[in-house]
Amino acid sequence: MATGWEPDGISENEIADGEAYHRALYINGDIGSPANWHRESAERLVQLAIPHIKDGSLVVDYGSGTGGSAIELLKEVEKRGIEINLVLIDPLVSWFSKARDLLKGRPNVHFELSIEKDDSGKLSFRRLEDMLGGRKADVIISSSTMHLIPERAIRDLASQFSGSLKEDGVFIWDSGDLESEFRPDHSALLHDPYRAVREILRNDEIRASRLSEMSSEEVLQHEGRLDRIFPGPYSMDVILDALGAVGFSSETHHEVVGFSNDDAERFALVPRLSEIAAPLLPGEERDEAIRAALKIALADIAEQGKGSHLEYRSHWVYGVHRLG
């Protein structure tokens, strides 16, 4: 049985949020049927990690979400008859509780919630070395997480990775939402459609009416929070430079992954992500507004030559980093 963190007092809304994101990764929630974009992007990450994994390896999945990358990794190691110790780490209770539910029956799987609350109620991120209890990992993977880390925090996180790996350890990550000099002109970034939806709905009449009932300070805080759901992209060089500064070598890869319009809609309607349309009311009002805006956004991406009437092409980058 899995060990470590367990959800306590999770709400129905949080359960629904985790289930919706899981279904954005797996068709109808079936872990045997990953959505094309998840299958292709995770497959490359797993194949880069496998050569560094052997029986008994301690593998850390940093930013596990609902467990999508961990599930794909476990499929591959089991196929090869390899037994690993896997630590999943994430700060979001709603998504992480779904990962716990999916993997709770597996041995050698451990969960660590990466946020904690002090006596005053203030939340902060726990350090990786503390979550591992002094153990050193053979491999750290991180899927679709690095682009969500603020630039100012990357250097410290790189140091945590360095301090939490064995001398011959490796850090492997992927992202579909970082700028790079080798992104093909015919591809978009992973979150481009959803940032476009945010902009289209920014001046929606119903939204504007609801915002007008707030104070200017409330509007500023509200809109700032929404802008952070799909933050603007920065260069992958920020990450490579930070990792290099703490002693990592760097090897990079990239590929273009198709993201179907149907998958994009499922993704955009995940409750936590659909907050980009707030204060439109959750449910039909919000969902219909997002669907309409997403249709416009995807058509515009196709018009730019970065997709078709069926999908957009997302550009993914991968990093493999060794110490020494």
Question: Where is each model-derived feature located?
Answer:
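A short glycine-rich, Lys/Arg-flanked "PGG" loop and its adjoining helix->strand segment in the class I
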Residues: R155-E167
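Class I SAM-dependent methyltransferase SAM/SAH-binding core
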Residues: V60, T66-R127
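A short SAM/SAH-binding and catalytic strip from SAM-dependent methyltransferases
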Residues: D138-A153
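C-terminal helical/coil "lid" or tail adjacent to the Rossmann-like core of SAM-dependent
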Residues: A24, N28-G29, E251-G305
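Substrate-binding/catalytic lobe of Class I Rossmann-like enzymes that use SAM or dcSAM, i.e.
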Residues: E199-A278
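A short acidic, Gly/Pro-enriched loop at the edge of an enzyme's catalytic core
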Residues: L123-I140
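Conserved class I S-adenosyl-L-methionine
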Residues: M1-K54, G68-E72, E76, I172-R210
